[in-house]
């Protein structure tokens, strides 16, 4: 059999290799995906396999930098695959060399389960609708057996359930009822939960609560315009349009996936798991191209729910590791999801059969006005002396849907050298049925008759691979502190002294820190080998992030064990190429036991992280206590954080941006007439805008 595999692999290699993209970090093309899957099929000839993942195995950091900065060889083009083999436990994973079209690495992992794909989820609804035991439970809930086409489910990863462990590839089906296909099912949840074997496509068990609850008889809580007209009589009058125009075109330049904008240059990648990946981020500082970050992405997230009742403890989706921000990404619509002058990037994946599939317009790139960049006026001449510069920001965005929730991710580049991540949470609350005489509290809120929306958290892990002014970086916590010297002392005579206390992390254990609102804690990532000529301090990028709620699940709980990164706002570990995912490579149905992911990387906490290549992981998010205003469709809830330069430049890097208006004191004295660059703004109710 091994000889047959070798022959098949050699036959595949004899065919032409797919064209190689211009940049080694570019995602796999459809031709590369097909070539990779054909190679894997040939290698496993005679076996019944299906594909779960086919994606780029990014070049090693060192190899990439040698190619980019030192004239080294082009890194090999590799595809990473995960497959399932019928009748075999776990997965097989490996690498395909796309130049030789050969499998160069493969291994079997029998005690893990792979990420859930859209194909996996789409089959679940039909499985439960046709299962006799589910039909019986629907009838007991008050739904006629001939209305199973009105029963819907959100297929969730099961998280972990000790009854089955990792032996079967499972989903839990959260079940709902629609009286009409346009209804929102979330106002009519059912009280039982089928467990579905994804590969066998059958229900293997149904979790049934001790107390039974009939399906709600209340009208569905719907939200489309036709429903709102029925509710309130009419929609609001349509507001006059606010048009975004750029008659002279955009100011960014795209070369393949490489972006150049306002002195920034970086590569935009996209994969099945993290979605958008920003790599090789640099800044052209008046001719000196300075590296900032080697790679930035969202590496994991968890949404733990707060009801202690069985089986709600299983509701703690690690959406990035269990579904994939890439797999679940939306095709974006011009003028709706993104507004203005837009450039899109598509995303390419493999289906179970090994054929390429494309999500059109997966990534949106555009510019927006961002208000004032800076302004100063002089009161001495009645504010005639004035400098006003407006800001433009570059936004790289995607939106992905994880069952009921939408996650809108916006990577924002700013003209003062800062990089911001804005996340907007919207979509629909996950709901569970309330009996007529039941109270929701304290673990949830009654947001509609018979509807309980449970308390929950959204916690994200931001992975930062820094290269602040080159290799050899460090990290520190920065806290605002009052002077230790007492009022009236020579060092603090008037009692008003305060300062920034910077604590550099020497070891991994030092870095395990949490946000402190009392001290306005921020974190610096810096290069200790360089010095700002003015401040005498090392060039750094400061992480400013104040939305850092603690993980509320108890230490030792299933939630805490499966998210070993979420117990601290910051975890800094030594760099290794394979340290990508802080809950491990294969997250579904992991019990949280054992040493893997962040738990493995932290170890005993003694490793050095000062003046070396480091990985900086940041946990942030929100705690959500639902309210009726969040239902039936939730207004977008914002989360934001910023990476801003500190001691990186010698002055405000945005001063060379063309101002909107500039009048010096000497010009004001000579009564020089100047007009603003903006010729489109006008007064709302009369005339045109003034000259200033």
Curated annotation (Swiss-Prot):
GO biological process, any: amine metabolic process
GO function terms (MF aspect): copper ion binding; primary methylamine oxidase activity; quinone binding
Disulphide bond pairs: 338-364
Residues binding Cu cation: 456, 458, 624
InterPro entries for the chain: Cu_Am_Ox_Cu-bd, Cu_Am_ox_TPQ-bd, Cu_amine_oxidase, Cu_amine_oxidase_C, Cu_amine_oxidase_C_sf, Cu_amine_oxidase_N-reg, Cu_amine_oxidase_N2, Cu_amine_oxidase_N3
Pfam families: Cu_amine_oxid, Cu_amine_oxidN2, Cu_amine_oxidN3
Induction: By methylamine.
Name of this chain's protein: Peroxisomal primary amine oxidase
């Amino acid at each position: 059999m091994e000889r047959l595999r070798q022959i098949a692999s050699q036959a595949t290699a004899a065919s032409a290799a797919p064209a190689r993209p211009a940049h080694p970090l570019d995602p796999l093309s459809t031709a590369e995906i097909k070539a990779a899957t054909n190679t894997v099929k040939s290698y496993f000839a005679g076996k019944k396999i299906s594909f779960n993942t086919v994606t780029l195995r990014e070049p090693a950091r060192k190899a990439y930098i040698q190619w980019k900065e030192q004239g080294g060889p082009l890194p090999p083009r590799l595809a990473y695959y995960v497959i399932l083999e019928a009748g075999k436990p776990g997965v097989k994973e490996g690498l395909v060399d796309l130049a030789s079209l050969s499998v160069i690495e493969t291994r079997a992992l029998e005690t893990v389960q792979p990420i859930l794909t859209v194909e996996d989820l789409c089959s679940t609804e039909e499985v439960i609708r046709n299962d006799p035991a589910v039909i019986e439970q629907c009838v007991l809930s008050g739904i006629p057996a001939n209305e199973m086409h009105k029963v819907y489910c959100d297929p969730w990863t099961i998280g972990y359930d000790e009854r089955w462990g990792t032996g079967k590839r499972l989903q839990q089906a959260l079940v709902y009822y629609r009286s009409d296909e346009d209804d929102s099912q979330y106002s009519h949840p059912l009280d039982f939960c089928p467990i579905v074997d994804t590969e066998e496509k059958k229900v293997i068990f149904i979790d049934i609560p001790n107390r039974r609850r009939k399906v709600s008889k209340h009208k569905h809580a719907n939200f489309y315009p036709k429903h709102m007209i029925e509710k309130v009589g009419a929609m609001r009058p349509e507001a006059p349009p606010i048009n975004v125009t750029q008659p002279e075109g955009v100011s960014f330049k795209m070369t393949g996936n490489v972006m150049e904008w306002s002195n920034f240059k970086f590569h935009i990648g996209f994969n099945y798991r993290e979605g958008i990946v920003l790599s090789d981020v640099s800044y052209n500082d008046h001719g000196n191209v300075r590296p900032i970050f080697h790679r930035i992405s969202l590496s994991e997230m968890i949404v733990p729910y707060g009801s202690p009742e069985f089986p709600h403890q299983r509701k703690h989706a690690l959406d990035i590791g269990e579904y994939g921000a890439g797999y679940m990404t939306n095709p974006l619509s011009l003028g709706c999801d993104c507004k203005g002058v837009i450039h899109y990037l598509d995303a390419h994946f493999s289906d179970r059969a090994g054929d390429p599939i494309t999500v059109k317009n997966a990534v949106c790139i555009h510019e927006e006005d961002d208000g004032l960049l800076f302004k100063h006026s002089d009161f001495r001449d009645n504010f005639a002396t004035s400098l006003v510069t407006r800001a433009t920001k570059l936004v790289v965005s995607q939106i992905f849907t994880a069952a009921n929730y939408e996650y809108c991710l916006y990577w924002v580049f700013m003209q003062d050298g800062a990089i911001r991540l804005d996340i907007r949470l919207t979509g629909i609350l996950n709901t569970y049925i309330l009996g007529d005489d039941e109270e929701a509290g304290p673990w949830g809120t009654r947001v509609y008759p018979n509807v309980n929306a449970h308390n929950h958290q959204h916690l994200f892990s931001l992975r930062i691979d820094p290269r602040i002014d080159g290799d050899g970086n460090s990290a520190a916590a920065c806290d605002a502190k009052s002077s230790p010297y007492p009022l009236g002392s020579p060092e603090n005579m008037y009692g008003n002294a305060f300062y920034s206390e910077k604590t550099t992390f020497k070891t991994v254990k030092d870095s395990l820190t949490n946000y402190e609102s009392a001290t306005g804690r921020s974190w610096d990532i810096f290069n200790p080998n360089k010095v700002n000529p003015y401040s005498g301090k090392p060039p750094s990028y400061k992480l400013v992030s104040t939305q850092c709620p603690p993980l509320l699940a108890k230490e030792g709980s299933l939630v805490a064990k499966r998210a070993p990164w979420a117990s601290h706002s910051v975890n800094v570990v030594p760099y290794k190429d394979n340290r990508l995912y802080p809950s491990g490579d294969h997250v579904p149905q992991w019990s949280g036991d054992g040493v893997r992911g962040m738990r493995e990387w932290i170890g005993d906490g003694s490793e050095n992280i000062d003046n070396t290549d480091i990985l900086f992981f940041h946990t942030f998010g929100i705690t959500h206590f639902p309210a009726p205003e969040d239902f039936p469709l939730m207004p977008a809830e914002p989360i934001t954080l910023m990476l801003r330069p500190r001691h990186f430049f010698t002055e405000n890097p945005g001063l060379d941006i063309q101002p909107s208006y500039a009048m010096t004191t000497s010009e004001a004295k000579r009564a020089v007439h100047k007009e603003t660059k903006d010729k489109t703004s006008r007064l709302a109710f009369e005339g045109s805008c003034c000259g200033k």
